Amino acid sequence: MKNLIQFMTRVPIKGDFEKAREEVWMLPLLTPLTAFIPSLILYLNIPLKNVLSILSLYWVIGLLHLDGLADWADGIMVKGDREKKVRAMKDVNTGIAGTFAVVMILLIQVYSLFSAPFYSIYLAELNSKMAMLLALATKKPLGEGLGKYFMDKLTTKRVFLGGVLYALLLIPILLYDPQSIFALLGLVGGIYAVKISLDNFGGLNGDCIGAVGEITRGATLLILGVWA
């Protein structure tokens, strides 16, 4: 688990990158770590809790996935064939589509927390991690890179075990508030992002996986914010 923590978060822990892909099925298990501080901020109801909660979240998980969302959006929005879209996604310069996507996902998260319950960031992170795991489970890599690197070691058994972890981490919140079951709808956003990626690029790379995680978290918070 420490290897996955070292790669997927900014927590200062030593890990082996080569072993991280052996632990990728444990992605949902990162949620208590990544969502603890943001959830605590919301629970304590301190001033500017919405902004501070999101800032603390990215302080823990870093900006890698957010950067992936920007690249993904640039590729999705460009007109042309798959080759042109992939080239736009891999361009080191962020375009207007990428900037717009990042700004929108941040605004959605911050403003959703005005009405969403304190545990919503936990559910959003849990969904985000599960959606990323499901994206990797497609086994449809886009060339060589991080996407293929993690897909290669992800078996059906490991995906199932990841699903079990997801369920076990979800149950306590469902017992606390049965209406939180609606958070599951947030996964639809991630699944749709996977479909868009496959339709536009023909596969998934690290940018696509990061975008799936960000979109799923934003969709979950939006649903919980509206439902509340």
Curated annotation (Swiss-Prot):
Query: Reaction catalysed?
Result: alpha-ribazole + adenosylcob(III)inamide-GDP = adenosylcob(III)alamin + GMP + H(+); alpha-ribazole 5'-phosphate + adenosylcob(III)inamide-GDP = adenosylcob(III)alamin 5'-phosphate + GMP + H(+)
Cellular compartment(s): Cell membrane
GO-annotated molecular function: adenosylcobinamide-GDP ribazoletransferase activity; cobalamin 5'-phosphate synthase activity
Q: Which PANTHER family match?
A: ADENOSYLCOBINAMIDE-GDP RIBAZOLETRANSFERASE
Q: What is its EC number?
A: 2.7.8.26
- Give the metabolic or biological pathway: Cofactor biosynthesis; adenosylcobalamin biosynthesis; adenosylcobalamin from cob(II)yrinate a,c-diamide: step 7/7
Read off the lineage from the record: Archaea, Methanobacteriati, Methanobacteriota, Thermococci, Thermococcales
Question: Where would you say this protein principally sits, based on its record?
Answer: membrane
The protein in question is named Adenosylcobinamide-GDP ribazoletransferase
Could you tell me what this protein does? Joins adenosylcobinamide-GDP and alpha-ribazole to generate adenosylcobalamin (Ado-cobalamin). Also synthesizes adenosylcobalamin 5'-phosphate from adenosylcobinamide-GDP and alpha-ribazole 5'-phosphate.
Q: Output the InterPro entries linked to this UniProt entry.
A: CobS
Family, as annotated: Belongs to the CobS family.
Q: Which GO terms describe its biological process?
A: cobalamin biosynthetic process
Lineage, top-rank taxon, reads: Archaea
Gene Ontology CC entries for this record: plasma membrane
Per its UniProt record, the required cofactor names are: Mg(2+)
Q: Which HAMAP family match?
A: CobS
Which UniProt keywords are listed?
Cell membrane, Cobalamin biosynthesis, Magnesium, Membrane, Transferase, Transmembrane, Transmembrane helix
Membrane topology summary: Multi-pass membrane protein
Transmembrane domains' residue ranges: 24-44, 50-70, 96-116, 117-137, 159-176, 181-198
